[in-house]
Amino acid sequence: MIQTNSIFDKINFNGGNLSSDGGSILLSQFLEKMNLRKLLDSIPFVDLRHLPVYSNTNILFQQIIKCLLGYNDQSDQKILINDPLMSLKSLICSQATVSRFYDRVSLNTTNEFKKIITQLACDFVNTNIDDPILDADSTMVTTCGNQEASAYIHHYQENGYHPLVINEYHSKLLLSSLLRTGSAYSSNGIIEELEQIFTQLNNTGNIRFRGDSAFYRRDLFKYLENNQVTYYIRVKNFKKNIRESVMDMVMNRVNWNDFDYTEPYYGEYTIQINKTKKRRIVYKAFRLEKDGMLQLVPMVYCIITNDFEKSPKEAMDFYEARGNSENFTKELKDDFNGGILSHKEFVKNEVDFLISSLAYNLYHVFQQTILEEKDQTIRMNTYRLKYQKIAVKVIQHARQVTLSFSSAYKNKTQFIQYWNKVLQI
């Protein structure tokens, strides 16, 4: 039998000037120190309003803050309006105002927005990363109904958009975030995106690029070689490549039945492009068993590279480490709502995707600048639980504002340390 007695006589939600997002001051103060609003001022909009109460920059800034805090629906705008901490520094606009904001975006808006994301990320990488590693990947954003530019994507067996993302491996930052139509091939736009990145990124011959077999393109190889970029790209499963790998093992008298998945054989051979240029194929091979019987031909897994210094195993291990970058994309989609785009018009969805991308980058810049030790590896959702969702009372008296946090908060020592670091920027 369910016990209905309670030690509480009444409950209500009329607690006064209380906020459940007290820890949001860390990120909001950090963004003020970065002068983010000034950067956003350069984004153009098709705005015919006369003496608007809210500028487009103000509304966009609110949407970025909202994304960082994990409020992903337009209806969540009411939470910001009613929150005594969120509405303390600036007037929060209504949900209807946000909806009309999206009517003023255009292709010029998204182009300039994208440039800002690339510029911020490249500036951080140039300052903090000595040997950048660029990981390119395509992903999927599921669509519903008749959303513009949505298409069936055979690889995912679903309708959706097909974004292209390029992360810098050490910093996790998105150097490029391109929302593409559902009909776009996985590597469409890769050279154009790299061109934009290389105008901002310091290149002293120390940049490395990794991509899966979708990026196995001769024009991409040539472009990267011309820009002194070392690349590691998975080779498509052409019969010719498998045959060449098997022949190399035969020539070296290797019995592939002596190698399994946990301990494969690593080998290499070269491809002559012209009289002066070669490319290197690195492969690993191992036996396959099916129904208790060994297959006649080994399983062969190849990458192509212009790196002739690493051993075959080192080159293969370096390529396979790119799998961690797929977790960065998962964080973008899951923790920053980049996997849900609900507008009918494509350009509006592109703005939402860029908001998620910028929020993702801002968090990781904040993480590497302010957070310490194990906190430098936590995902955004973990950060929100640990440092954002703190009960706080907002007290305004004699032109002063005091934030009175819960005394039961267990991470207060670390929080105060992070707060002081933000103030010192």
Specify the residue positions occupied by each region the protein language model found:
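Catalytic cores of alpha/beta
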Residues: R218-K222
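Dynamic "connector" segments at or just before major functional cores
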Residues: M1-Q200, L224-N227, Q367, I390-I425
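Basic, amphipathic alpha-helical segments enriched in Lys/Arg and hydrophobic/aromatic residues
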Residues: G339-Q400
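An anionic, glycine-rich sequence signature occurring as long contiguous blocks
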Residues: I2-I7, T230-D334, Q414, N420-I425
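Short, glycine-/Ser/Thr-/acidic-enriched flexible segments
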Residues: T139-V141, S171, R180-G182, F238, ...
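Short amphipathic alpha-helical "interface-anchor" segments enriched in bulky aromatics
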Residues: F30, Q77, M140, P312-V351, ...
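Structural motif
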Residues: L18, R49-N58, L294, H343-F353
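Acidic/histidine-rich, metal-coordinating catalytic segments
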Residues: D137, N206-F215
